[in-house]
């Protein structure tokens, strides 16, 4: 296993385009409604996924209880697969740079797996042969063809395996046959097939690791100032890694933060000594070096604010937050997984939100620079 040097300075089936209509605006973004519970009365499940073309994938329940994976960009949505056909259950979706929605699904008769494209035409991996079942959900590169998943094989010494693939040969990234004891439920992959994940070793240390099949690089681990890490780190197409961790500061206090690993060094992006008390479950990082996360501000003199942010200033870096106007209503709340790594290389952000008028809806936030190009 190759370990990078880490500094002590602290500081992740192409569809036809239809015209998208913005429904509301903040100072830096306009918002395009992808779907709401008017069309999906049985509910829409978070999180949602976004690719570089602005296509958003989500799981929703139509009239009659038909559940499916759907894709839209603002206008009519396309059904990728639903329970009126082969599949009986769907997990959280992804969407790759080819426009193919990727998803976990059960087919009945104890058969299930990860699939891509219309009606799951491409099988990423199924629970046949050596594969017993799966853990976590699929993550796909928004700019490439690769997807990564965690699976549970039948071999006792390999209780967990992370693999990546694009519908062809599946590549083993990491497993628990050696020093690792627990692997990330939600690894992430970039356009070149490099996978980032959090893992705990059998000696109770833990860290953030990157691999593409073969030797792994250690981005950060608990041999230094870091004391713990969260699952779901992000990786961009340059191989930079954004992760959430806890660290001991110079005063011996434990603080939480978002940290960036780039070219063997680590710097602090944001931490809990600032305006935010929490940074959500799955921060995002794009090729421009922009970040996005679902955060909650500290409640010192005002009520805490939950929303999606792109930096440390809750006002200047706010994309959308509770009590903001949106689509003829106001934002009443976010689920824990309203946002999960759904930032693309154009700076667009997809998310699920609850509105004061009773709707639950999926939106894409479009930065004004993107719309003006």
Summary of predicted features, one role per range:
Residues 25-373:
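Conserved "turn/edge" positions that cap or connect secondary-structure elements
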Residues 9-22:
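Bacterial N-terminal signal peptides
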Residues 1-11:
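Bacterial N-terminal signal peptides that target proteins for export
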């Amino acid at each position: 296993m190759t370990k990078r040097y880490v500094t002590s300075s602290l500081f992740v089936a192409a569809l036809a385009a239809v015209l998208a209509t913005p429904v509301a605006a903040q100072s830096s973004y306009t918002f395009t409604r992808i779907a709401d519970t008017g069309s999906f009365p049985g509910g829409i499940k978070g999180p949602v996924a976004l690719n570089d073309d602005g296509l958003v994938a989500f799981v929703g329940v139509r009239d009659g209880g038909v559940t499916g994976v759907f894709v839209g960009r603002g206008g009519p949505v396309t059904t990728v697969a639903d329970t009126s056909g082969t599949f009986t259950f769907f997990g959280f979706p992804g969407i790759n740079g080819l426009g193919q929605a990727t998803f976990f699904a059960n087919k009945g008769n104890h058969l299930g797996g990860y699939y891509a494209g219309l009606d799951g035409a491409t099988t990423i991996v199924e629970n046949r042969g050596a594969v017993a079942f799966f853990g976590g959900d699929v993550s796909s590169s928004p700019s490439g063809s690769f997807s990564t998943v965690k699976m549970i094989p039948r071999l006792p010494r390999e209780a967990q395996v992370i693999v990546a693939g694009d519908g062809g040969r599946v590549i083993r990234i990491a497993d628990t046959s050696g020093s690792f004891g627990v692997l990330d439920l939600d690894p992430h992959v970039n356009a070149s097939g490099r996978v980032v994940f959090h893992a705990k070793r059998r000696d109770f240390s833990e860290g953030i690791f990157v691999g593409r099949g073969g030797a792994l690089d250690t981005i950060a681990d608990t041999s230094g100032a870091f004391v713990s890490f969260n699952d779901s780190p992000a990786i961009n197409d340059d191989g930079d890694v954004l992760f959430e961790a806890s660290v001991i500061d110079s005063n011996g206090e434990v603080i939480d933060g978002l940290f960036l690993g780039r070219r063997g060094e680590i710097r602090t992006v944001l931490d809990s000594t600032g305006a935010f008390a929490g940074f959500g479950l799955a921060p995002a990082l794009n090729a421009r070096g922009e970040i996005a996360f679902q955060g909650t501000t500290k409640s010192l003199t005002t009520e805490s604010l939950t929303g999606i942010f792109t930096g440390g200033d809750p006002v200047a870096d706010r994309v959308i937050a509770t009590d903001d106007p949106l689509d003829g209503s106001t934002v009443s709340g976010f689920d824990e997984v309203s946002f999960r790594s759904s930032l693309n290389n154009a700076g667009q952000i997809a998310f699920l939100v609850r509105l004061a008028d009773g709707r639950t809806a999926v939106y894409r936030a479009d930065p004004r620079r993107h719309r003006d190009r």
